[in-house]
Each structure stands twice: as C-alpha cells, then as structure tokens.
C-alpha cells in the first residue's frame, strides 16, 4: 500500500477504549467480576500474511473471597478467541492469563500461574497505542518479558504500608521445555520496583530478570549462552489529560530472531497521548529494537517504526480507532524482517 494512501486513511478515522468489569456477584465476602472485549478490526498492508480481518474476542473474570479480616484469596482467567477464522479451523482460542493466590493486608500478595512477567511492569507504560506498540523487548512466552507460564509472583504495594507509592515485585519462573524452542525457558527470577513519589503525577520504574536457557536453545545457530538476561527502566507522566511514557531496556541471549536469538538487544519506546473532553485521544509513539553482534549479520534493527493513531470514545463501552504503523526498517535488512507499513482500523465494544 502506498504511504500516501495510508496517510489519508490515518487522517480519517479514530481509536479504542478501556472500561471497568461488570460485577456479577458480591455477597458474604465473595466477589466475581466479568469483563470482555470485542475488537472488530481490519489491517491494510502489502504484507500478505497480515492484510485483512484481524478481529478477536477476549473474555475474562476476576474473583476474590474474604477468608478472614487479614487474608483474601483471588483468581483471574482471561482468554482470547479468534474472530477471523473458519469454524472448521483449529487453534482459535488461547489462554492469556490464569492464576490464583492470596493477599495478606500490608504484607502483599502471592500467586502462581500464567501471569505477566516482572519486566512488563516497566514495558506496560508504553504499550498504549490503539493497536500496535509494546513489541521491542516485550514478547509473549519469552522468559519474563510479557505474559508467560509457571510464574510465582509476590507483589507489595506502598512497601508494607511504610512508603506511599513504592511498589515491589519478586518473581520466579519454573522451566518450560515442552514447546517451540523460541518459547522455552529454564528456571529464572525477576524483580521490579516502581515509585510514584507518594501519589504524584510522575513515576519511575526499573526491572531485572535472569533465567537459565534450555539445551535446545543453545543448539540454535544464533545466540548461545547459559543465561538469558534483561533489564529495563522507565518514566511516566499521567495528569491534566496528558500521558507521556518512555523506557529503555537491554536483553542478552533472549530476544528471538531468525535462526535463534540475538546475543544482545538495545530497546527504546516512547508514547505521547492527549485526552480531549469530547472523546478524542490522539497518540504518537516510537518503537526501536537494535540487535547487536548477531552471528553472520553484525548489528541490525529488529523493530523500528513510528506510530500515529487516535481513539474516539463514544462512551465508556464503545470506541473506534485507527493506528498507522510507519515502518522504518530497511527493505534489504539481513534478517529478512518485513518492512511494510500497516494501518489498523476498527471498533471496540468493552464491558
């Protein structure tokens, strides 16, 4: 698709919303909330495998039970269902989140299951584009960078009730070897710290993860080493209808590429958004991931694009969106990564 045509599309449409869950049950210390989203979406691009319908449905619940005055149990489940597949197709559903745990007042919470990795505590701040974004160092089932399985997670807010706005995460991930080699991981741990200066409009965060790699991963052509390691740091401002966030991260022997893994990546993301009173929320962002010291390649951009989008909120449940991914990768990049632009347009119903 010509970039001039894409630009005209971008000028014409608008983008997505977030709302609260619907309370299904709340009685005798037991509470259950149901939430969901229908995203009717179409991609326009010269990249054949992405062009066309990309619609999906997400459904989840969050429940909690009051065990006593100090202890609360909780659980969460979320799944996604493809809306662009034939009814006869397999693999139309995937579990995004599934964990359960307990919270003991100021001492914090502990849970286990499929959850968000510690590094995503930083990366989530820029994962705010209407459709794209959040894909430099954060990837699903890639150690503890995003959603992953086998996570034991301890979270503490306001640091045991002593320091307002200081949040701590400690995480352990058990090994997962019964899957595609790029989705495997050995035992690992992660941690993150976030501080908003006692409830101010500014916040800073940092995270670190370190994991064993599997034997199969070390047999790949690219990216060897016993450990997969990552760190990230971020800044956020959220006030006066303005949202600004940025982060920088580095990974070692972790980020999947053609033929294996990148020995090192340097990653940067930024987003700026403004919420108008009449419902429009324009968005401007940038995402960059540079692969370093790749066998047979050297240094090469893995992700590099400017993102221009907008969201229009009809009300708390309904929105429309457009998101224009302006790809900055070279057409002759040595890893054969697609460099076509993509425009995503659609509507979202959420509850």
Swiss-Prot record:
GO terms for biological process, alphabetical: monoatomic ion transmembrane transport
Any one GO MF annotation of this record: porin activity
InterPro entries given in the database record: Gram-neg_bact_OMP, Gram_neg_porin_domain, Porin_dom_sf, Porin_gammaproteobac, Porin_Gram-ve, Porin_Gram-ve_CS
Record's note on what induces expression: By phosphate starvation.
Main location, first listed in the record: membrane
CC per GO annotation: cell outer membrane; pore complex
Signal peptide start-end: 1-21
Keywords: Cell outer membrane, Ion transport, Membrane, Porin, Signal, Stress response, Transmembrane, Transmembrane beta strand, Transport
SUPFAM superfamilies: Porins
Protein's membrane topology: Multi-pass membrane protein
Pfam families: Porin_1 (PF00267)
NCBIfam families: PRK10159.1
Function in brief: Uptake of inorganic phosphate, phosphorylated compounds, and some other negatively charged solutes.
Stated family: Belongs to the Gram-negative porin family.
Record protein name field: Outer membrane porin PhoE
Native source species: Citrobacter freundii
Name of encoding gene: phoE
């Amino acid at each position: 698709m010509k970039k001039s045509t894409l630009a005209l599309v971008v000028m014409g449409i608008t983008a997505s919303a977030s709302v609260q869950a619907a309370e299904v049950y709340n009685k005798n210390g037991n509470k259950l909330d149901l939430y969901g989203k229908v995203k009717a979406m179409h991609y326009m691009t010269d990249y054949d495998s992405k062009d066309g319908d990309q619609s999906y449905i997400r459904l989840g619940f969050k429940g909690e039970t009051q065990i006593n005055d100090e202890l609360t149990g909780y659980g969460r489940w979320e799944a996604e269902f493809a809306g662009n597949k034939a009814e006869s197709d397999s693999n139309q559903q995937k579990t995004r989140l599934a964990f359960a745990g307990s919270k003991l007042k100021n001492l914090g919470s502990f849970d286990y299951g499929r959850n968000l990795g510690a590094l995503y505590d930083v990366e989530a701040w820029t994962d705010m584009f209407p459709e794209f974004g959040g894909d430099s160092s954060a990837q699903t089932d890639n150690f503890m960078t995003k959603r992953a399985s086998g996570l034991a997670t301890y979270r503490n807010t306001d640091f045991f009730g002593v320091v307002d706005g200081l949040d701590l995460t400690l995480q352990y991930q058990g090994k997962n070897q019964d899957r595609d080699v790029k989705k495997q991981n050995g035992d690992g741990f992660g941690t993150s710290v976030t501080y908003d200066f006692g409830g101010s409009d500014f916040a800073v965060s940092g995270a670190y993860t370190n994991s064993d790699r599997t034997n199969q991963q070390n047999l790949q052509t690219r990216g060897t080493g016993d450990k997969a390691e990552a760190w990230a740091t971020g800044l956020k401002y959220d006030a006066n209808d303005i949202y600004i966030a940025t982060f920088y991260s580095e990974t070692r022997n972790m980020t999947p590429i053609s033929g294996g893994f990148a020995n090192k990546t340097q990653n940067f993301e930024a987003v700026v958004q403004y919420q108008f009173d009449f419902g429009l929320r324009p968005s401007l962002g940038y995402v960059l991931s540079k692969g370093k010291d790749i066998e047979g390649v050297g240094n090469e951009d893995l992700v590099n694009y400017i993102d221009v989008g907008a969201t229009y909120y009809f009300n708390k449940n309904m929105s429309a969106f457009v998101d224009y991914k302006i790809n900055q990768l070279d057409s002759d990049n040595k890893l054969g990564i697609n460099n076509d632009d993509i425009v995503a347009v659609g509507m979202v119903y959420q509850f």
